[in-house]
């Protein structure tokens, strides 16, 4: 009797990507666009196949309450797919923009005594806002 590999016992997440999903967070909005091509080359060299994109990008996607910018994200996704990389689009809620904290202070995190934590920390939101 042959023992089946554990990997063979579970269905693939995506049959077009039948490999271990090695990768991590990729935050290109924090770097000049001129570095993105080099990033793709480094991903290729390190067998980095899957990038989580957008975790801290809220302010880059929505620089003002009434303004959205997706051009940079479109460019990054195009570069990733052209370089034969996969991506997971994250919700950009880990770092809310300053305009939101100023316009809606109730979204700021509160400590156990109800004091609001000022803007500038990661994951600075209040779940009950």
Each PLM stretch: what is its role?
Residues 21-33, 54-72, 117-129:
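The substrate-binding groove and active-site-proximal loops of carbohydrate-active enzymes
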Residues 11, 37-116:
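Aromatic-lined substrate-binding rim segments of carbohydrate-active enzymes
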Residues 3-35, 41-50:
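An acidic-aromatic substrate-binding cleft motif
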């Amino acid at each position: 009797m042959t023992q089946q590999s554990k990997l063979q016992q579970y269905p693939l997440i995506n049959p077009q990507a039948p490999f271990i999903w090695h990768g991590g967070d990729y935050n290109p909005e924090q770097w000049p666009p001129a570095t993105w091509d080099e990033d793709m080359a480094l991903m290729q060299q390190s067998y980095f196949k899957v990038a989580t994109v957008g975790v801290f990008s809220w302010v880059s996607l929505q620089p003002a309450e009434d303004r959205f910018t997706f051009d940079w994200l479109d460019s990054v996704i195009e570069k990733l797919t052209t370089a034969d990389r996969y991506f997971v689009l994250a919700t950009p809620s880990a770092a809310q923009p300053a305009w939101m904290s100023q316009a809606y202070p109730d979204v700021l995190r509160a400590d156990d005594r109800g004091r609001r934590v000022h803007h500038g920390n990661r994951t600075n939101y209040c779940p009950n806002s």
